[in-house]
Amino acid sequence: RWVHDYFMREVRPLLIPVGLDPAHPFPQVANKSLNFIVRLKGRDAFGRENEIAIVKVPRALPRLIRMPPKVAPKEALFVSLSSIVRAHLHDLFPGREVTEFSQFRVTRHSDLALDEEDVRNLRTALRQGLQHRHYGQAVRLEVSAGCSVFLSDFLLEQFDLPGAALYRV
């Protein structure tokens, strides 16, 4: 019960599922961020039948949450944010059936290359370079061990990666 309340109070307000369709293309996914790909059946509240949705989990949320003493009075117990989101994915899609899902994380090329001759303002160049690192070229894709071939192939295509860049963890 505590986990459900925590999800509804602290996590759910920050999650924005994006149903993919021509008007809503695959979103930008930051380097090494926690994300979920979800396969759905049925229509959403607007009558759309988008089969795939992406749920990006904000970095502002702690990855490990300590359960309060009233729930675990004798020892410190922690629950992972990813397991909380996994357990409540269906709450993000009312009236729809979640048929499969997978957690995923993309690693992006993060070299910072600055041309000393072209850089007039080092501070600005560094700021722009560091921002670009979050959304550089994808080089590796991690998915849950049980991720279906359909979902992993879909993600590989979105990130323009070969099969050799896929890691099941």
What do these predicted regions represent?
Residues 1-169:
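N-terminal non-catalytic structural scaffold regions of very large proteins
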